């Protein structure tokens, strides 16, 4: 979830040209993480890109925009046209909000942002997913199940190309893919 919440517009290519040529993508190189105020000081200064302002006075934690855990977590992920169009619509909506709210909009360049531009809480994203699951009568799954499903289908589509799937999913080691998803290849 952190990588999704840390996605910024400078890492998204949903231009008209990219959509027409079917080469739309997102580049994952950041994540939002909630950490204790004390832990912020212990994080490597190179890791922390931004510390978001707290919304509560005496909050013991803060949200930070930071680099991912490993170098292999940084990756380009191609997205289908329908997802690209959703992102185009989100960008238009955010631009309208910026015009309406003016200086009240806190622009951190986040793709997934609140009405006022702040990062969305991961719990909100989980709650929204659960709401859709309940409304549609779908089996209960956790958010991480989406990643598992994605890797599963990529393995099937690639004919079991572990290296390709490893790079696309951001797994640091190929054996992480084979251990978790080996049953699909068999």
Task: Give the location of each predicted region.
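Short, contiguous acidic/charged loop-to-helix segments that flank catalytic cores in large enzymes
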Residues: 65-74, 113-121, 137-145, 154-156, ...
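Short helix/loop segment immediately N-terminal to the Walker
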Residues: 94-107
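Extended hydrophobic-aromatic, low-complexity segments
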Residues: 15-16, 28, 36-40, 87, ...
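C-terminal catalytic core of tyrosine-transesterase DNA break-rejoin enzymes
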Residues: 1-3, 124, 128-135, 145-173, ...
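Catalytic-site neighborhood detector that most strongly recognizes the C-terminal catalytic loop/helix
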Residues: 12, 19-23, 30-32, 169-186
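Active-site lining segments that contact anionic ligands and/or coordinate catalytic metals
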Residues: 23, 72-76, 107-109, 146-149, ...
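Conserved tyrosine-mediated DNA breakage-rejoining catalytic core shared by Y-recombinases
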Residues: 6-96
